[in-house]
Swiss-Prot record:
Gene this protein is translated from: srrA
Induction, per UniProt: Up-regulated during anaerobic growth.
Domain of life of the source: Bacteria
Name the UniProt record assigns to this protein: Transcriptional regulatory protein SrrA
Mutant phenotype after disruption: Inactivation significantly enhances staphylococcal nitric oxide susceptibility.
Residues with PTM 4-aspartylphosphate: 53
Subcellular location: Cytoplasm
SUPFAM superfamilies recorded: CheY-like
Key word Repressor present: yes
PROSITE patterns the record matches: OMPR_PHOB, RESPONSE_REGULATORY
Example GO biological process: regulation of DNA-templated transcription
Length: 241
């Protein structure tokens, strides 16, 4: 696994600050000050993570993430001074895995990066070890964890890495209710710095993508009002034998 991180921000002060803190954790840092440069570097290199500012010259962060997701699944943490829900949703829609609003603590950014990489590395190790075929099957939904592929009514659904991890986590324990704090801790590995709206935004996007090809698959992700979410499996939706 690479220890190289790409920091993309048009403010030199922010790049220097993040570089200093991340280098203390033994990461190798690369920098870009505009969107076009960031996209070219990301395509040429296999970074462990990209810290991507939303407002950039030449090509903004949304455009960079959207174009990059057509070719790569490099983990992306979006950095922005805008905290409104619309901007957060746009960031996640473009393929970002996380979202941090400026002004932020550099230590928080380091913790977010480490949490994201722990999850990514854990998934890579699990997939590389010899094991029986890891597939979760329901009447309207199939999750092939070996191929990292989701089928809803036999049609492939293109999910971001974090949307996929969230779906897997819920589907592995059908009908169990998880509150938002649990999901932040287990899927995002946040205990102190997580924004609960991150969970809501990812669930919304996951449902929308599933619903495009199968309303039945989308309806399996249920909101438990005042608590959180569950992956609902009824008797006629039991995993295929």
């Amino acid at each position: 696994m690479s220890n190289e991180i790409l920091i993309v921000d048009d403010e030199d002060r922010i790049r220097r600050l993040l570089k200093m803190y991340l280098e203390r954790e033994s990461f190798e840092i690369h920098e870009a000050s505009n969107g076009q440069e960031a996209y070219e570097l990301a395509m040429e290199n296999n970074y462990a993570c990209i810290l991507l500012d939303l407002m950039l010259p030449e090509m903004d962060g949304i455009q960079v993430a959207t174009k990059l997701r057509e070719h790569k699944q490099t983990p992306i943490i979006m950095l922005t001074a805008k905290g409104e829900e619309t901007n957060r949703v746009e960031g996640f829609e473009s393929g970002a895995d996380d979202y941090i609003v400026k002004p932020f603590s550099p230590r928080e950014v380091v913790l977010r990066v480490k949490a994201l990489l722990r999850r990514t590395q854990s998934t890579t190790v699990e997939q590389s070890e010899p094991h029986a075929r890891d597939v979760i099957e329901f009447k309207h939904l199939e999750i092939d964890n070996d191929a990292h592929r989701v089928l809803a009514d036999n049609q492939e659904v293109n999910l971001t890495p974090k949307e996929y991890e969230l779906l897997i986590y819920l589907a592995k324990t059908p009908n169990k209710v998880f509150d938002r704090e649990q999901l932040l801790k287990e899927v995002w590995h946040y205990e102190f710095y997580g924004d609960l709206r991150t969970v809501d935004t990812h669930v919304k996007r996951l449902r929308e993508k599933l619903n495009r090809v199968s309303s039945e698959a989308a309806h399996m992700i249920q909101t438990v009002w005042g608590v959180g979410y569950k992956f609902e499996v009824k008797s006629n939706d039991e995993p295929a034998k």
